[in-house]
A protein has these predicted regions:
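Gly/Gly-Pro-rich "capping" loops immediately C-terminal to redox-active cysteine motifs
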Residues: 107, 513-550, 561-569
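Conserved beta-propeller blade signature
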Residues: 70-74, 128-131, 178-182, 250-254, ...
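C-terminal capping alpha-helices of c-type cytochrome domains
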Residues: 423-425, 430-434, 440-444, 542, ...
Length: 592
C-alpha cells in the first residue's frame, strides 16, 4: 500500500461539502502539461478527455471529492456479485503525481469479514466524512495527518429500513446541515404480492409510512433514530441520487420508475410499452411534496402522471388522484436506472454546463426483447426555477458498457458522479470497480454547440420490429446455437429452442435474462444459473421448472426474491421449456 507524507493546513471549507483542506503537493503554477488523452472506451463531446483514475475497487457506489482532491468512495458488499475486495468497505484515493491516476489508495472502515456491508451514500460536511453502513449513517472525523480517519465513526442516524427491493440509503447534506436520506420502496408497486401478475395495489399503501420517500435529519447531531415523523417528501419509489442545489439550499433527486407493466398487466400494455414506460425522473423535491408512487407513474410520451394499473389504471388514459401529484422537472427513457446526480458547480467545463445536472444511468434490465439502454452519463440543463429543456438533454458520456448492454455482462455500469475542486467529473462503476475522471482540455467554447441529444422516448432505441427478432445488442452467449445444446431426457430440441426465446424475452416477455444476465451468469438482480450449485434448485429439469413456476417469494441466500415466473404469465409449456434450456446450458458450464 502506498503512503505519502502530506503537508496540510488547518482551514475548513465552510460550504456544505466542507472537508479538511490541505495544500496541493504541486503548486498550480507547476502543473505539468497534459499528456495525450488515452482511449478508455468512452465517447465524449469534443474537447473532453477521460482517464481511468483507479480500478479493481470492488463495487464502488457513490463518491465525493474533498477540497484537497482526495476521492472518497463507498462500496457495496452485496454478496454473490463477484470477488470481495480485501480491507474496509470505504476507500480513499489520491493522485499526488498529477497524472490523473490515483497512486495512493487506502481502504478503511469495517471489512466484509467483520460484517461490513458498505452501501451507497457518502458526503462531506464540516471537515467530516459521512457514510452509509447497513442501517446507519455514520460520521468519520478527517484529520490533517492522513487521508483516512483513524478513530471509530459516530452514529448520526440508525434504524433505517433495509428489507425489500431497494435497501440502499443515498443521502446529501445541504449548507445548513440538513441531511436528506432516501428510504426507498420495499416493492415494485406496493402490490399485495410483489411483482406478481395482476396483483392489486394495497390501499392505502401502508409502505409509505416508512418507505417510498425522503427523510430529513440533522447532520450535526448524533444518536438520531429513524422515525416516520421525519419524512420530508413522499411518493418517491427509489431516489438513488440526491444532490444539493447550486446555492446550497434545497435538493434534486432522481427517481427510478416502476417495472413490469407488460409482465404484470399484459391486457393493458404491450411489449413496446414495457420498454418505453414509465419514464425515469429528475425531481425538485419540496417539503411535504407527493410525487405519486405507487398510485401513479410518469408517462413521458403524454408528459403527465397517469394512474397505475394496480390502482385502477386503464393503460395510461385515466388520471384519478395523479392530477394532483407533483410531476418531475425532467424525464428520461424508461428503465435506464438513474443511480446518482450532481449539480455542476465547477469552472473548467464550458458555460453550457454551469448549474446543470449530471446523472449517472446504471443501465436497464427491463427492456427485453428490445435493446437495453442507459449505461451512460447524461447532462440535463436546469433553467431558472424548475424550467428544463428536453431538447438540450445530452448523452454526455457513453460507451461504459462496451460491446453488450446487459446488467450481467456490461464492462462498466455508472453508479456515482461527483465534481472535483478543479472542475473535473468523476464517475464510479460498480460492475468492475473502476473510477473514471473526465476533464476538459479544449477552449471554453469548443463544445458549446455540439452535443449528442438524449434519444426520443416514443419507440425503443434500436427496436427492429417484431418480438421474435433477436435484439440487436442482446446477442447472448448461446445466440443461434440452441440447436447444438444437449436435450434433457423426456424433452425435445424444439423445447430447448423455445426456452431460449422465453429466457431472452422474445416469447412470453418473461425477460429472465434481465435479472440473470443474457448469458445466465447472474447480475445484482439475480443469481448465477450456471454455478455448480444452484441457490434455489437442485438443477434437474423438474426442480428448475418448480422454481420458475413457484418463485422464491422471500430472499434466500441472495439479496432479492424472485416472483413466480419472473412476474410474467407463462404457459406450462413455456415454463418447462425454460427449465429445459437452463438444464442444457448447465451441462457445459464449468465445474460440471
Amino acid at each position: 500500500m502506498l503512503r505519502m507524507s502530506l503537508i496540510v493546513t488547518a482551514g475548513l471549507l465552510a460550504a456544505a461539502a466542507g472537508a479538511v483542506t490541505r495544500t496541493p503537493l504541486i503548486p498550480a503554477s507547476a502543473k505539468p502539461a497534459s499528456p495525450p488523452c488515452p482511449d478508455v472506451g468512452l465517447r465524449l463531446p469534443a474537447g473532453f478527455c477521460a482517464t481511468v483514475f483507479a480500478d479493481n475497487l470492488g463495487h464502488p457506489r457513490h463518491l465525493v471529492v474533498a477540497p484537497n482532491g482526495v476521492v472518497y468512495v463507498n462500496t457495496w458488499n452485496y454478496g454473490g456479485g463477484g470477488p470481495v475486495q480485501k480491507g474496509g468497505v470505504l476507500v480513499a484515493l489520491e493522485d499526488t503525481t498529477r497524472d490523473h491516476r490515483a497512486n495512493v489508495i487506502e481502504r478503511f472502515g469495517p471489512t466484509p469479514g467483520q460484517g461490513g456491508r458498505g452501501g451507497t451514500g457518502i458526503a462531506l460536511y464540516k471537515g467530516a466524512l459521512y457514510v452509509e453502513e447497513r442501517d446507519r449513517i455514520e460520521r468519520y472525523a478527517l484529520s490533517e495527518a492522513s487521508i483516512v480517519p483513524k478513530g471509530p465513526p459516530e452514529v448520526i442516524v440508525s434504524g433505517l429500513p433495509l428489507s425489500g427491493d431497494h435497501p440502499m440509503h443515498p443521502f446529501a447534506i445541504d449548507a445548513d446541515g440538513v441531511l436528506y436520506v432516501d428510504v426507498a420502496s420495499a416493492t415494485n408497486a406496493c402490490q399485495a404480492h410483489n411483482r406478481r401478475a395482476r396483483a392489486p395495489g394495497i390501499t392505502p399503501c401502508t409502505e409509505l409510512e416508512t418507505r417510498g420517500g425522503i427523510w430529513r435529519y440533522d447532520a450535526n447531531s448524533t444518536g438520531q433514530k429513524f422515525s416516520p415523523a421525519e419524512r420530508y417528501a413522499t411518493g418517491i419509489r427509489n431516489a438513488d441520487g440526491i444532490a444539493v442545489a447550486a446555492n446550497g439550499h434545497g435538493i434534486y433527486a432522481t427517481q427510478h420508475g416502476r417495472d413490469q407493466l407488460h409482465d404484470n398487466w399484459p391486457a393493458l400494455y404491450g411489449p413496446e410499452e414495457e420498454a418505453t414506460q414509465p419514464a425515469e425522473e429528475l425531481l425538485h423535491v419540496r417539503q411535504g411534496g407527493d410525487y405519486g408512487w405507487p398510485t401513479c407513474y410518469f408517462d413521458e410520451i403524454q408528459g403527465r402522471l397517469v394512474l397505475a394499473p394496480e390502482y385502477g389504471g386503464d393503460g395510461g388514459k385515466a388520471l384519478g388522484p395523479c392530477a394532483d401529484k407533483l410531476a418531475p422537472i425532467a424525464s428520461f427513457p424508461a428503465h435506464w436506472a438513474p443511480n446518482d446526480v450532481t449539480i455542476y458547480t465547477g469552472q473548467s467545463f464550458p458555460p453550457r454546463y454551469q448549474g446543470g445536472a449530471f446523472i449517472a444511468f446504471h443501465g436497464s434490465w427491463d427492456r427485453a426483447p428490445y435493446p437495453q439502454g442507459g449505461y451512460n452519463v447524461v447532462f440535463q440543463p436546469l433553467g431558472s426555477g424548475d424550467a428544463t429543456e428536453r431538447s438540450q438533454c445530452e448523452v454526455f458520456a457513453d460507451g461504459f458498457a462496451g460491446a453488450v448492454k446487459d446488467p450481467g455482462r456490461a464492462a462498466h455500469r455508472p453508479s456515482g458522479v461527483a465534481v472535483a475542486p478543479d472542475g473535473a467529473l468523476f464517475v464510479s462503476d460498480d460492475s468492475h470497480g473502476t473510477i473514471f475522471r473526465i476533464g476538459y482540455r479544449g477552449g471554453t467554447e469548443a463544445a458549446a454547440g455540439s452535443f449528442t441529444p438524449c434519444p426520443p422516448v416514443d419507440a425503443p432505441a434500436g427496436a427492429t420490429g417484431t418480438a421474435s427478432e433477436k435484439p440487436p445488442e442482446g446477442v447472448h452467449a448461446n445466440a443461434g446455437t440452441a440447436a447444438n445444446l444437449p436435450v434433457p431426457p423426456g424433452s425435445t430440441r424444439a423445447a430447448v429452442a423455445l426456452g431460449d426465446d422465453v429466457f431472452h424475452g422474445r416469447v412470453g416477455m418473461a425477460g429472465c435474462s434481465g435479472c440473470h444476465g443474457s448469458d445466465a451468469h447472474g447480475s445484482p438482480q439475480g443469481p448465477n444459473l450456471l454455478a455448480p450449485t444452484l441457490l434455489w434448485s437442485d438443477g434437474s429439469p423438474e426442480g428448475l421448472a418448480r422454481t420458475i413456476r413457484e418463485g422464491v417469494l422471500l430472499p434466500r441466500q441472495f439479496t432479492l426474491p424472485m416472483p413466480a415466473m419472473g412476474g410474467a404469465q407463462l404457459t406450462p409449456e413455456q415454463v418447462s421449456a425454460v427449465a429445459a434450456y437452463l438444464w442444457a446450458l448447465r451441462q457445459g458450464a464449468p465445474g460440471r
